[in-house]
Amino acid sequence: MDTLHHRFQQFQKTIWFNIFCYLWTGIFSFLAFAPVSLTHFVWIAPFGFFWLSLKYHGKYKKLFFHGLLIGVVFYAISFHWIIHMAITFGNFPYVVAILILLFAGLLFGLKFPIFMMSFSFLSGKIGRHSVWVAGFCGLLSELIGPQLFPWYWGNLAAGNIILAQNAEITGVYGISFLVFIVSYTLFQSNPWHWKEIIHSKEKRKQYLRFITLPALLLLTFIVSGIFLFKKWENVKPVKSLNVLIVQPDAPLSFRDGREIKESIEALMARIEKLTDEGAVRLGKKPDLIVLPEAGVPFFSAHKTEITTKVRRMYWDRFDSLMFLLANRYKANVFFNEIDAGFKGAPSPRNLRYYNNNVLYDPNGDRRDSYQKKFLLMFGEYMPFDFLYELSQQTGRFEPGLTHNLIRYYTPRYYTLAEKEKSPKGRHLGWTDTETFNHEAVRSYYETTRTEVSETGKFLPLICYEVILPEFVREFRTAGNPEFIVNLTNDKWYGATTESDQHMELGRLRSIELRRWMVRSTNSGISANIDHLGRFVGNKKTGLMTAEALSETIDVIDSPPTFYTQYGNLIPWLMLFLTGIYYLNLLIGIRRGKSA
C-alpha cells in the first residue's frame, strides 16, 4: 500500500495527473447523470476538484485555468449533443460546431473554477473546517455560476428517489450541498489513511469527529426523504384524468426530397391515427389529449388578421383537425402552434412571433393559451441581430407576458341520449378536411355541441422552461395548479443523451410542486411523472419514434409546498449564515496575525 501511495504521489506531479483529474470528474459525472443514472458515482465525481485544489493550492490563476479545462471536458462528455444541435439547428459546419461546444464548456462551466478557487482560499485559511468549506463553496458555485442548460450536482444525486424527495424543502441546491459534504468526507477517507486510523486510537478519535457531522447530515437527508416519501405516497388523489399523449415525430424541416404537402399530409394523418390507437388502448374516452411542441410545425390554428393576411401562418386544416379530435372524443385538446402579433403600432418592424400553447375544449372551442416566456438563446432568439446572419434557422420569437394557468373542461350531459349524441352520419376525419373548409366542419358538428363546465387548471410549460426551478415557481402568482403539462421538441438533438437529461432535469419539478406531470415530446422522451418523481407505470416512449402513450393520472389536492412558497430560501440562508461565520473567522485570524 505504501509503495502504491508513493507512486500515486509521484504521478500527481505530472501533467498526466491533471488530465486524469479532468477525465475522472467528467466521466463519473456522466455516469451518474441520465441516461446511465449510476447515481452512486456522484459521491466520488468531485474528487478531481479536490486533487487539483491540493496540487495547486493558493495558485489561483492555475486553479482557474484547470477549472475551465474540467468544464470543457465535462461538456465534451456529458453535453456532446451540442455538436449535433449546432449542425442540425444552426446549420453550422462540423468544425464550427466543435468550437461552439468548447466555448459552451468555457463559459457555462465557470462554476468549476469558482468552486476550486474559493475552496482553495477558504480551506487554506480555515483548514479544520474544510469539509464544510467544500459544501459552502459547492453551494456558492451552483448558485452564482452562469448556465445555458442548467444542471446541478443535486440533479445527479436525485437519481436516488429518497434523496430526491428533499427537493420539496431545499430545492436541488440543498442536495448539491450534501453532495460536496459527503464527497469531501469520502475523499479524506481514502485508503492511504486506513492503516494509521486502525492502529492509532488518537487517529480513530480524530476520524470519528471528522465524519460525525457529515454522517449526521446524510442521515438527516435520508430520514427526511423517507418521511416525505411515505407522507406523499399515502396522500389520496381527489380525482383522476385519462390522458392521451401523442408523439408524432414531426419533421424539423422539409428537406428530404418530398413535396411539403406530401410530408405535412402524412404527419396530420399520423397524428389522427396515433390518437385513435391511443384511445383504443386506453379503453375509454380521454379527458385530455396532449400534442407536443412543434407537433405541427410552422403553422398556426389561430385565425386572426395577422395570421391570415400579414403573415399567412393560419392553416384551416390544422385548426379543423384539432377541432375534430376534440369532438370525436369530447376531450380537451392541448397543442402547440406559432402565433403572431404586433408589439406596438402595426408595422412590419413591430411584428413578433410567439411559441404558443392553446387548449380546445370538448366542443372544439378555442380557450386559454400560454405564450412561452423563457426563450432559449441561440434557438429562439439571438442576443445580437448580426448573429441571425450566421444562423438563419434561429427563430425571432418574443417572450410571452404572463404566467398563466390553463383551464380545462368537462362536458355536462343531462340525459343518456344527449351523452350518446353523434354527428349526422359519421365522424369526420383528416381526409375530409380537404373538401370541408373549417366553417363546414364546425357546422357539421353543431348538433353535438354540449354544455361544458370548468373542471380545473394546470400549469403549462414549454420545452426548456421545465428545467428552471426558479422560473416555474413564478407561476404561483396565478394560483395552485392541479398538475403540470410540459410540451417539448427535442428532435434538434437527435438520438443523443440530451432527451434523457432534459427529462431528468425536469422530473424534480413534480417533487418540488408535488404535482403530477404530463410530458409530451415530438420525438421522445414522453412520459407521465407522479408527485414522487416516478415514471407512471414505468412507461416512457422511445427516441425518434411516432407513438401514443395512454395513462390515467391522479390529481393531488394540497396547498403550495414549502419550495413553491419560499423557493431556495434554505440554500441561500445556509450560504449567508456560513459566509458570515467564515468571514468572522477570517477577520479573527487576520487580527491574530497583526497582534
Swiss-Prot record:
One of its GO terms (cellular component) is plasma membrane. The chain crosses the membrane at residues 30-50, 63-83, 95-115, 167-187, 210-230, 569-589. Belongs to the CN hydrolase family. Apolipoprotein N-acyltransferase subfamily. This is Apolipoprotein N-acyltransferase 2. It comes from Leptospira interrogans serogroup Icterohaemorrhagiae serovar Lai (strain 56601). Catalyzes the phospholipid dependent N-acylation of the N-terminal cysteine of apolipoprotein, the last step in lipoprotein maturation. Residues 241-555 form the CN hydrolase domain. One of its GO terms (molecular function) is N-acyltransferase activity. The lineage of its organism: Bacteria, Pseudomonadati, Spirochaetota, Spirochaetia, Leptospirales. CDD domains: ALP_N-acyl_transferase. It is an enzyme of class 2 (transferase). Signal peptide: none annotated. The active site is at residues 293, 372, 463. The gene is lnt2. GO terms for biological process: lipoprotein biosynthetic process. It comes from the Bacteria. Pathway: Protein modification; lipoprotein biosynthesis (N-acyl transfer). It is a multi-pass membrane protein. Keywords: Acyltransferase, Cell inner membrane, Cell membrane, Membrane, Transferase, Transmembrane, Transmembrane helix. Its EC number is 2.3.1.269. It is found in: Cell inner membrane.
